Structures are given as structure tokens and as C-alpha cells.
Amino acid sequence: MISYSLPNERPNDFSRVIPVVKDIIESVKTKGDNALYELTEKLDKVKIDNIKAREEELKTQASKLDPKVKQAIDTAYEQLKAFHEMLVPPNIGGGYQGISFGVIWRSIEKIGIYVPSGKYSYPSTLLMAGIPAKVAKVKEIYVASPPTQEGTVNPALAYVAIKLGVNEVYKIGGAQAIAALAFGTESVKKVYKIVGPGNVYVQAAKYLVSSVVGIDGIEGPTELVIIADETAKAEYVALDMKAQAEHGPDTYIVLLSNDDELIRRVEEKIKNDKKIYYIIKTKNLDEAIEIANKIAPEHLSLYVKDAYTLMDKIVNAGAISLGNTPPAIIDYVAGPNHILPTNGWAKIRGGITVYDFIKPTMYANVRDINKQLLEASISLANYEGFIIHGKSIGARYE
């Protein structure tokens, strides 16, 4: 199904589930582990014997993993690690007018990673969140993910958890997992920040606990905007649109093109799909860029002749695929993260990197302050009514 005009809003309204999620959070806060056992049995239809996966349990599950999948995980791990190691910032120091100053970077000490699960498990999500956290030297990493129908940990997830060296894995999912990581229970450690994607209940829970714990963001359904000119292959464009539609019925997929023939050929390949695709004919590529920057999509593909030049004009996008690069490869092995901002949040932040797990601490050492700076600091303190601030400064340097 094709629409030739963009909707006013994208689907990301979790207000309808807020009352239910509030009750879940309150239950976990008051009943702790008992609530987690009850909710897992009620919502996931699984009875678990223990919340925290035992070390032997993880090893046993990991041993069941197909060797080809192990190799794929190992290969992806090295590529993602190389990308995030490139981003580690140095400590910086300098000075001006008698004052030494600088920034030192420190890791967040404890984080929680939520890994969704359903018909399939998503070990790539644990790689995407866990690798930058490890590169950032986070001391304690705790993972929560729904249990399998057998009440244990998915083999691929267990393998990645062992490879990353995470501290603990919890066999809990949904809003109750977010609440447990935010407030702690008898079995679940309380963390300082929670990252990872999830359904509307998970997002609502992250929103509700964000006053007591850091979060990476509130995310909606997957988004893809494609800007394509006459050099693009319709087959690739259509495949990429259909690929992102696999994420669910609410995915937001847009083709912006100034080429009538390309649009016609793409239409032929997607017109019978039940999924809604948006196709917009633009006057030129500059108009396409303007629309894309307003949308601020999670994924942006530039199927154009000079992709690097066009990329210089993009200011709002979670991740950009250049030329014939399929967005799907970013979901796995390209290097950039697949945990990306949606619903316009790319206007103010990007995907998960080491910067989500470190924080800058600024310092100053005042030695031989010049008279102008000294007088300025005392005058400003007095003007704002902080008289003793001024005296504290003056006592040392006047």
C-alpha cells in the first residue's frame, strides 16, 4: 500500500499503557522478586525457577548455539569493537590567565541493558549495547531479557553475555524488568542507567523511571527515509523498504526521489504489500534533504550519485547509509549502532556510543589569577547575592 503524503504524526503514543505500567512498577517496588516471578508467569506464560541465570546455566545454553551463529557473533563483535574504540575521547587539559583547567572522562559505574525477545531472540542488540559499554570501561553490566519457554536464557544471548563478560543476566522482560533495574530487588541489582529497545510497555516503563535512573531514550517504531536519484537501483530501494517493514506494522518508511522512472519501478515492487509506504516526488534533491532533516529519521539512506556531498547537508539522522549500502547491514556488522533515536529525537541526539556510558568531569586549578578575573568573580558573586562566595574567593587571592 502506497501513500503519497506524509502523516502529521508518527505512531509513538504509549499513554494508553501508562496506567498498567504504573501498576507493574509499583508491584515490583513493593514486592520485589515475588512480583517478578508472578508477572513473568502471568505475562510471559513462563514459570522460572530463578531470576538470575547461574554461571553454569549460561555456559550450558551457550554450548547449544550453532557454530555458524557463534562465528557470526565473533565477526560482528570485532567490527563493532573497532568502531567504538575509535570514538573514545582523550582527557584534555589546558590553561588561560593563570588558571589550569580541563576535562577528565569517567565511566558510569553500573548499567542495565534490556534485550527484547519474542518469536526470535536478538543477540545483536546485546552486542550493540554491550560493546560500547565495555569499551567505555563500565565496571558493572547487568542484562535483562525475557526467558525462553523453557524458563532459561536463549543460547545466542548466553554466548554474547559470556563473551562480553557481563556481571549478571536476569530472566525477566517487559516493564517489570525495567522497574527491577531501576529500583533493585532481592535478585536484581539497581543500576544508574538503562539502555536498550523494547515494546510500548518497555518504553513507557523507561519513561516512568527516568526520574530515578538514566535512560538512553524513549523510542518508537523503526524508521527509514530513502533519498534516491536516477542512479539508484529500484530493486535495492524496494528491498530495503521491505526489510525495515519486517520490524512491525507501525514502521515508518519513506522514499524521497526526484526521478519519476525510479518511483514507478519501486511502486511496482511494493504496491501489493499490506504495509503502508510513503513515496514523495520532490522537485530536486535539496527539497528531499529539507524533508529528511525535518523528519530526523532513525535510518537514512542516500542512494545518490554523490552521497558524501549530500551527507554534508544532513543535520538530523540517527544513522546514514551511503550509496548502495543497505541499512540492514548497520543492524548487524557495519560498525555503527542499531539502537538509534526515533520519532524525531535525532534532532538532539544520536545512536548509542561510548559517550552514553562516560561522563565528563571538569576541573580547575587556580594559581596566579589575574586581577581582572578576580574582581569579575567577586563582583558577580555579590551581584547575585552570594556575599560569602565573594569572600571565599577574595580570602585566597586578594
Curated annotation (Swiss-Prot):
Instruction: Give an example GO biological process.
Output: L-histidine biosynthetic process
In which domain of life is the source organism classified? Archaea
Alphabetical list of InterPro entries matching this protein: Ald_DH/histidinol_DH (IPR016161), Histidinol_DH_CS (IPR001692), Histidinol_DH_monofunct (IPR022695), Hstdl_DH (IPR012131)
Q: Does the keyword Amino-acid biosynthesis apply?
A: yes
Catalytic residues (positions): 298-299
EC number, as in UniProt? 1.1.1.23
Q: What class of enzyme is it?
A: oxidoreductase
Cofactor detail note? Binds 1 zinc ion per subunit.
Q: Which family does it belong to?
A: Belongs to the histidinol dehydrogenase family.
Q: What is this protein called?
A: Histidinol dehydrogenase
Q: Which organism is it from?
A: Saccharolobus solfataricus (strain ATCC 35092 / DSM 1617 / JCM 11322 / P2) (Sulfolobus solfataricus)
